[in-house]
Amino acid sequence: MPVLNPFNRRLSIGLTTAAAALLLSISAAVAQPQALLDNYTPVTLEELANPPASDWLMWRGTPNNWAHSPLDQINKDNVDSLRLAWSWTMEPGKQETTPLVHDGIMFLPQACDFIEAVDATDGTPLWEYRRATVDHVAPLSCANRNGTLYKDQLIIATRDAFIVSLNATSGEVTWEQKIGDWTVGQHYSGGPQVFNGKVITGMSGCYYINTSCWITAHDADTGEELWRTNTVPKIGEPNGESWGDVPNEQRRGGS
């Protein structure tokens, strides 16, 4: 059996200790983001109606769409002392979304239905979702105001006219429903909202063809469509007379 001389033995012990320290460091780095995912709590209807000050659960923050945060740590007396904590390169394209935040995780909906989840404290990536691209006829279809957190889901409305539910801790699709036809220009530009367990969305892109758009409600757990209403009434429908003698095929508009 070979015997290490004292120098080699000390070198071996030193390398082993360094390797162990490196492994512990890597394990700790991996454990931190995993702990965020493990500790994620489902978003309730009560939280959607009255979000915690530290959270931003939908595009405009609250159901009334005020886009106002009650946080007061940053004010006119200290705003000039703000410094960059971390930065993140977004997907190229038109950006009209706002980051969503819950339990220390920041969700970044971006152009053309690309979603990333990161550690809000330092930007460490947690997962990403990239929807297949389509050759859309609507030039603004990649620009949307997307995303609502509910239960353990991130619910988005896409440029190819689908509503999609992603698992908030993995980015995996839990359900998706086709609502319109992207090949004729229909798409979602506004994000979904959740009320009483229903996902409410309004279709866009109907100005490209002779038809009106609509608003739909879907079961948040399954995506099943529960009701649909046209935003432009047809002849014989309630308020249809408000369009006078305009035929149905010329009654069109967005939602």
Language-model segments: residues:
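Bacterial N-terminal signal peptides
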Residues: G14-S27
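Blade/loop signatures of beta-propeller domains
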Residues: Q32-L84, G236
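Short coil/turn segments that connect the beta-strands within blades of beta-propeller domains
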Residues: A53-S54, D103-I105, K151-D152, N196-K198
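Short glycine/acidic-enriched loop and turn motifs that connect beta-strands
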Residues: P63-N65, F114, F162, C206-I209
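Extracytoplasmic beta-rich repeat domains
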Residues: W86-L100, E128-Y150, E176-G191, N230-S255
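Conserved beta-propeller blade signature
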Residues: I105-P109, E116, L154-I156, I200
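Short loop/turn segments that connect beta-strands within beta-propeller blades
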Residues: D119-D122, N167-S170, A220-T222
